[in-house]
Amino acid sequence: MENLILEIISGKQVTKEEALKFFDFELEEIFFAATKIRRKYKGNKVKVCSIINAKSGQCSEDCRFCTQSTFNKTDVKVYSLTDTEKIKEFSTKALENVGCFGIVSSGNSLNDVEIEKLCEMFKNHKKVSHLGVSIGKISDETFLKLKEAGIKKMHHNLETSENFYPNICSTHNYQERVDTIKRAKKFGFEICSGGLFGMGESLKDRIDLAFTLKALDANSIPMNFLMHIKGTALEHLPALPPVEILKTIAVFRIILKTPDIMICGGREVNLRDLQSWIFQAGANGMMTGGYLTTIGRDITSDKQMIKDLGLEIEPNHTY
């Protein structure tokens, strides 16, 4: 066991079978490996990001975890694309405290008019290099428009393994999501893609997801943990124990090694007093200030936590 950890720190690529065994290790053992790898590739810098839910609700997809799906019976706010000047103002203000900012929309995709509005705003945004978009399925034509407008980063989660995906969504398939990522890479975008954990998937499913993301060469891996929202199909699932969450983060760092690992939705609810342990588990980034339809923790508290740990916030990370 100790030899395996030392080999991994030295650069050994783990197999799926070896990765699965890490869930049986003591927490301090897996922390040791994950922290060493994080420091090797990321130092003591922490990336902090935030998002805006620019278009909310009325999604035609049946993702069982999502508050914005019309197949789930939630009281989520419903509104069309937010005025782009308001998005611009909100993102500019947010970027005074965070290094990157994501514009997220509900639904399978945006229409041509919505894309044109966003692209016009991007062209006139002084901090466009700090922006990313998460707008669903995207055509090659739209990829080109976004690139010409200055966008460099594309977010598109795989959510889980290909094997488990039919359990959470039937209105589109896994390969469609993979293809969107591959086409984004073809157009030269940085890729932000990760998953949601605690939906009933197995440990093997989590490892399969990590290896898929590794094969896709994703630059940033957002890790989200299920929040049990009333009205969603998954609201009655048991919550993941905090230690299992931390081990999952560590296994992702051990498998993936070099990408940014960002801890996002569900951090506060699921980790509670163990939130600061995400960095020992190998994460080097976090989302702050709230999520799509749920409240997060304020940036001041998160910045203090990072400072107390002797870590530094990485300023102005562009794509």
Curated annotation (Swiss-Prot):
Q: What class of enzyme is it?
A: transferase
* Gene3D superfamilies to which the protein is assigned, alphabetical: Aldolase class I
Quaternary structure, per UniProt, is: Homodimer.
Q: What is this protein called?
A: Biotin synthase
Keywords for this entry? 2Fe-2S, 4Fe-4S, Biotin biosynthesis, Iron, Iron-sulfur, Metal-binding, S-adenosyl-L-methionine, Transferase
Matching PANTHER family, A to Z?
A: BIOTIN SYNTHASE (PTHR22976), BIOTIN SYNTHASE, MITOCHONDRIAL (PTHR22976:SF2)
One of the Pfam families matching this protein, by short name: Radical_SAM
- The secretion signal range is none
Q: Which residues form a coiled coil?
A: none
Q: Describe which pathway this protein belongs to, using the record's wording.
A: Cofactor biosynthesis; biotin biosynthesis; biotin from 7,8-diaminononanoate: step 2/2
Would the keyword Iron-sulfur turn up in this protein's UniProt record?
yes
